[in-house]
Amino acid sequence: MKIGKLNSIVIALFFKLLVACSIGLVERTNAALESSSKDLKNKILKIKKEATGKGVLFEAFTGLKTGSKVTSGGLALREAKVQAIVETGKFLKIIEEEALKLKETGNSGQFLAMFDLMLEVVESLEDVGIIGLKARVLEESKNNPINTAERLLAAKAQIENQLKVVKEKQNIENGGEKKNNKSKKKK
């Protein structure tokens, strides 16, 4: 009888310890991700400030036009966009790592919180002229709520794919020479 009671106490204590460790891990993960998100947003603001110093007039951006056709400092603007994309990629990698850690034990609230951090970061990209990304990601999430690691990773992949397209448009690899692929020949 005493051994059964002792076993019950040991099991209860073990369970409480396991829950406490799990909660501590989740809190540390959230704090680390929030800190990383804040750092990235600060880096994006720094990138914008540096580009402004190189002659980019971000105030010239219109609702849909955020390229060198509406502002000065074309190469500096394209470099700023690429720098912001590279830094965002690092943050998205951290999100992926944490999502995979929580894949089995995480709950929908945790994945949604991580998604919200991704949206905040994507929104901060608008400061350097990368617009419309948040709206596209939100539209997709309406059909597939972000409540699992798989859906969070799918949203992350969508962001990465769209950022890849923006990065390729900047054409930095070719010495900054911007080519216009549209043919203006008329027959």
Swiss-Prot record:
It holds the Pfam family Decorin_bind. Transmembrane segments: none annotated. Residues 1-20 form the signal peptide. Gene3D superfamilies: Decorin-binding protein. The keyword Chaperone does not apply. Keywords: Plasmid, Signal. Belongs to the decorin-binding protein family. Binds to decorin which may mediate the adherence of B.burgdorferi to collagen fibers in skin and other tissues. This is Decorin-binding protein B. The lineage of its organism: Bacteria, Pseudomonadati, Spirochaetota, Spirochaetia, Spirochaetales. The gene is dbpB.
